[in-house]
Amino acid sequence: DYGIKYGGKLHEFKTEEEFYKFLGMDWIVPEMREDTGEIEAALAHKLPKVIEVKEIRGDIHLHSNYPIEPSHDLGKDSFEEIINKAKSLNYEYVGLSDHSPGVSTHTRNQIVKLIEKRTKKIEQLKSSIKNIRIFNLLEIDILTDGQLSVPKAGLKMLDGAIAGIHSSHSQGKKTITSRLLT
């Protein structure tokens, strides 16, 4: 699989690393192969260092199967399963950031009540699990008018939020940008 004809001779290689070296390049990890200047950087031996899994200290964008009646799909694992996996990876922290409750199926008061119930569960975990930091987060929709899908009373219960546009993607560039900046 790793071969090249050069000077009328077939040069074969056992690894990609050997192949790249033959071409005078540093090996480019697959994650970096995006046609954004990595070939030039490899030829100049100036590729950036890739973060290794052991260097990752945590993850703040994790969706659980907690029944918050979200605007989008639930995750597959429970809070406890997520935390146990994070601990097995030696993470220092996790952010439980499920999608917020759907605005088309809940009143603002119902959204706050669902967040309150979820927050109580996360607070119980925070008090019983001491060797990893747990953040109570939500992924919140930015609505078509630029407002957030979670009322301020719900936001106050969170450690933070991830806000994103999940609907009306066909709006014009100016409108979409305005939604993000509101």
Q: What label would you give each PLM region?
A:
Residues 1-58, 72-77, 81, 87, ...:
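Extended substrate/RNA-proximal surfaces in nucleic-acid metabolism proteins
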Residues 61-65, 99:
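Histidine-centered divalent metal-coordination motifs
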